[in-house]
């Protein structure tokens, strides 16, 4: 993928593509003047002997310590070395690439006082697929993502290591792959690299992208379950949802109508049945999934803004010659967006688990107990439903909001923090849980449909059915179940059901 970056204009679709695959990045020339002006402003402050935080002072609680001109370069190198204190497993290439893209986008806005040379070095690393070692843990999301961004920056100054096409290389070798040599950071540049919400935002963006894929899958699986359970189409009638007026609900109901078309032989087979109302997990899908969609859209809006934001501190306003300390590094918007995504993921999984449970109950589903013939000898989906219940319950605990947590840091100078990285990275575990739940529902709904006398569903639902059946056959009798769940989960992880939903329903698709 080639991406020509106009600073501050990244879209969610751009970010999704950059997360999914390597990118060839170029920077629009319009960035040159603002970048140069901000650097000149920093240089003028030093030349005039003015005091400005982060340029010629210490950091955090040490901000009142004035640094001599002779030590300014050492100051910037020292902040990178000392702040690289993260722990845990290394982020994968996709996450590091996303972090670096976000950092380039922020720095290139021209409010950070960092030279084009440094920004170009980050771009060169991205283009050469050289990804610095960044540990998963160590940021509280204020004052920015200091530790992980310090690890990202170590490679630029010839320290630490980076991964290139699966191989770890010492920093000097990694730089050489990208045609670079170690940099000497000028005044303000170390702080500009470290300060910002790019890691928190990348964590939450991954959560958003996975949540979107799972939302699409849950909508399709929910439609399949309606068919398998001989559910009514009446609850999806557009008039019901227009009367309420909730945009997300209206859009989701339309998506279900698109899946549950009148061409379905399954639907026609029970048009004259005497069932009045279906259980809520079937009937209220537009209401619940619509609320989830609204949460996801709101979170996506916040994250797209943050992806294009300047979250450095202090900020350089070159036109006025001012350097002003503020708090854009505080990732509270990201933390709250991630918390809202967590609520949506928990509900998507919870609703799916309830549909699975309905299909297991022969009194509710009018299907063989646990979706298998010769019950007793065969246990069918009995324990698969238990697995889904365990995963749904796990997500209830993980959905607890991270943004309400705060621990003071930096000797109480940084006395309120966002915990945005925690809010973001727990989304990955939640998404994995939801993927497992939906895998069981997909398997179960297709098994249920196979019992419906060979009747076909609508074209799109038949397409979803074929996708699964190409990998997992019908259950004639009990067999080793876990590999089937894994096969369905891998299909879901590919986003293979996204195309079955209307275009532009989800923010980044």
Curated annotation (Swiss-Prot):
GO terms for biological process: L-histidine catabolic process; L-histidine catabolic process to glutamate and formamide; L-histidine catabolic process to glutamate and formate. The modification 2,3-didehydroalanine (Ser) is found at residue 143. GO terms for cellular component: cytoplasm. Keywords: Cytoplasm, Histidine metabolism, Lyase. InterPro entries: Aromatic_Lyase (IPR001106), Fumarase/histidase_N (IPR024083), HutH (IPR005921), L-Aspartase-like (IPR008948), Phe/His_NH3-lyase_AS (IPR022313). Signal peptide: none annotated. SUPFAM superfamilies: L-aspartase-like. Pathway: Amino-acid degradation; L-histidine degradation into L-glutamate; N-formimidoyl-L-glutamate from L-histidine: step 1/3. Contains an active site 4-methylidene-imidazol-5-one (MIO), which is formed autocatalytically by cyclization and dehydration of residues Ala-Ser-Gly. Its main location: cytoplasm. PROSITE patterns: PAL_HISTIDASE. It is found in: Cytoplasm. There is a cross-link at residues 142-144 (5-imidazolinone (Ala-Gly)). Gene3D superfamilies: Fumarase/aspartase (Central domain) (1.20.200.10), Fumarase/aspartase (N-terminal domain) (1.10.275.10). It catalyses: L-histidine = trans-urocanate + NH4(+). GO terms for molecular function: histidine ammonia-lyase activity. Its EC number is 4.3.1.3. Belongs to the PAL/histidase family. HAMAP family: His_ammonia_lyase (MF_00229). This is Histidine ammonia-lyase. It comes from Pseudomonas aeruginosa (strain ATCC 15692 / DSM 22644 / CIP 104116 / JCM 14847 / LMG 12228 / 1C / PRS 101 / PAO1). The gene is hutH.
């Amino acid at each position: 993928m080639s991406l020509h970056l106009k600073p501050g204009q990244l879209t969610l679709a751009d970010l999704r593509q950059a997360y999914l695959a390597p990118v060839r990045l170029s920077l629009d020339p319009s960035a040159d003047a603002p970048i140069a002006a901000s650097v000149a402003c920093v240089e003028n402050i030093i030349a005039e002997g003015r005091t400005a935080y982060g340029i010629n002072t210490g950091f955090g609680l040490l901000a009142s310590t004035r640094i001599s001109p002779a030590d300014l370069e050492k100051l910037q190198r020292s902040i990178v070395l000392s702040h690289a204190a993260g722990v845990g497993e290394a982020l994968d290439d996709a996450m590091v690439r996303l972090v670096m893209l976000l950092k380039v986008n922020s720095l290139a806005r021209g409010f950070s006082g960092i030279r084009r040379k440094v920004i170009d070095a980050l771009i060169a690393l991205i283009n050469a697929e050289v990804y610095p070692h960044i540990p998963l843990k160590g940021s509280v999301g204020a004052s920015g993502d200091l530790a992980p961004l310090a690890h990202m920056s170590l490679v630029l100054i010839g320290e630490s290591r980076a991964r290139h096409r699966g191989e770890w290389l010492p920093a000097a070798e990694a730089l050489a792959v990208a045609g670079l040599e170690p940099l000497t950071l000028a005044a303000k540049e170390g702080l500009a690299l470290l300060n910002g919400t790019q890691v928190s935002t990348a964590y939450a963006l991954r959560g958003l992208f996975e949540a979107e894929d799972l939302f699409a899958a849950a909508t399709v699986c929910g439609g399949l379950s309606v068919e398998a359970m001989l559910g009514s189409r009446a609850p999806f009638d557009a008039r019901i949802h227009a009367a309420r007026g909730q945009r997300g609900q209206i859009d989701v109901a339309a998506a279900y109508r698109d899946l549950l078309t009148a061409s379905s032989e399954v639907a026609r087979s029970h048009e004259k049945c005497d069932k009045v109302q279906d259980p809520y997990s079937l009937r209220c899908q537009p209401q619940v999934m619509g609320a989830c969609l609204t949460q996801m859209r709101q979170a996506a809006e916040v994250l797209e803004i943050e992806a294009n934001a300047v979250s450095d501190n202090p900020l350089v306003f070159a036109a006025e010659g001012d350097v002003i300390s503020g708090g854009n590094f505080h990732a509270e918007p990201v933390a709250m967006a991630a918390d809202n995504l967590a609520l949506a993921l928990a509900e998507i999984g919870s609703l799916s688990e309830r549909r699975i449970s309905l299909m297991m109950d022969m009194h509710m589903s009018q299907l063989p107990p646990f979706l298998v013939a010769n019950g007793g000898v065969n246990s069918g989906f009995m324990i698969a439903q238990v697995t889904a219940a365990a995963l749904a319950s796990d997500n209830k605990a993980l959905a607890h909001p991270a943004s309400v947590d705060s621990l003071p840091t930096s000797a109480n100078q940084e006395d309120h923090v966002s915990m945005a990285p925690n809010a973001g990275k727990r989304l990955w575990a939640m998404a994995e849980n939801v993927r497992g739940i939906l895998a069981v529902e997909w398997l179960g709904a297709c098994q249920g449909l196979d019992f419906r006398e060979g009747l076909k569903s609508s074209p799109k639902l038949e397409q979803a059915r074929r996708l699964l059946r190409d990998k997992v056959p019908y259950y004639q009798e009990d067999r080793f179940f876990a590999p089937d769940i894994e096969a369905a989960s891998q299909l879901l992880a590919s986003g293979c059901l996204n195309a079955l939903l209307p275009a532009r329903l989800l923010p980044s698709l």
